[in-house]
Design a protein with these regions (language model features):
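PLP-dependent aspartate aminotransferase-fold enzymes
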Residues: 77-175
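Short secondary-structure boundary/capping elements
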Residues: 15, 46, 72, 157-160
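A secondary-structure boundary/capping signal
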Residues: 19, 34-36, 123
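Active-site-adjacent loop/helix segments that line or gate small-molecule/cofactor pockets in enzymes
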Residues: 1-22, 67, 157
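Conserved PLP phosphate-binding loop immediately N-terminal to the Schiff-base lysine helix
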Residues: 179-185
Length: 185
C-alpha cells in the first residue's frame, strides 16, 4: 500500500528511469514519454550535460532563498531578458506558480490604477492549475468541485470568440489569462 495521497487515479505502471524521450518501467519495457513528464522534462531524461550541471550545482549549494544573490540565477535572468526584450524575468518552478504570479501581478496592476475589483478574462474549458486561484480560473467544474468557495475576479468567455471578449471588456478588466497550448481542459 502506498502512503501517498491519492490525487490522481494512478495507472498500473512504475517508471524506473528515462533516457532522452523514453521512459522505462520495472520490467524494462520502454515507452515514448509523449507527456514529457507533464511538460517538466521537455529536455528529455538523463541528458549528460543536464545531469552534470545538476550534479555540479548540488555539489556546491543545492538551494538558498532568493533574498540572497544567486549568480547562476542572475546569469539566466540576463539571458532570458536579452532574448525576450523584457526588462525583468520571474523564475518559478511550475506553470501553476507562473499563473499564480501572473494573477497577482495583474491584480496589483489593477489596484495601482485605482481598480477596486480587477477582473481577469479566462477561457471556458481552459486549465490553469490546481492551486486555489488557478483552479478558480480553470473553466472545468470537475477540477473545481469540492474546493468552494472559489477565488472571484475571473470572467469566462469561449475560446476563439473575440466578440465575447469585446462584450465583457470593461474598465475593471486588467488581463487575459490564456494558455494557447492546452494539455487538459
Amino acid at each position: 500500500m502506498s502512503h501517498l495521497m491519492n490525487t490522481y487515479a494512478r495507472l498500473p505502471v512504475a517508471f524506473t528511469h528515462g533516457q532522452g524521450a523514453k521512459v522505462f518501467d520495472e520490467a524494462g519495457r520502454s515507452y515514448l514519454d509523449a507527456l514529457a513528464g507533464i511538460a517538466v522534462s521537455t529536455l528529455g531524461h538523463a541528458h549528460p550535460r543536464l545531469v552534470k550541471a545538476i550534479a555540479d550545482q548540488a555539489g556546491r549549494i543545492l538551494h538558498t532563498s532568493n533574498i540572497y544573490r544567486i549568480r547562476e540565477q542572475e546569469q539566466l535572468g540576463d539571458r532570458l531578458a536579452a532574448l525576450s526584450g523584457m526588462d525583468e524575468v520571474f523564475l518559478c518552478n511550475s506553470g501553476c506558480e507562473a499563473n499564480e504570479a501572473a494573477i497577482k501581478l495583474a491584480r496589483m496592476f489593477g489596484h495601482q490604477k485605482g481598480i477596486d475589483s480587477p477582473a481577469i478574462v479566462v477561457m471556458e474549458k481552459a486549465f490553469h492549475g490546481r492551486t486555489l486561484a488557478t483552479l478558480s480560473a480553470t473553466g472545468n467544474r470537475k477540477v473545481q468541485a469540492g474546493f468552494e468557495p472559489l477565488v472571484s475576479g475571473f470572467v469566462r468567455v469561449p475560446f476563439d470568440d473575440l466578440a465575447a471578449v469585446e462584450n465583457i471588456a470593461a474598465n475593471n478588466v486588467v488581463a487575459v489569462l490564456l494558455e494557447p497550448i492546452q494539455g487538459e481542459g
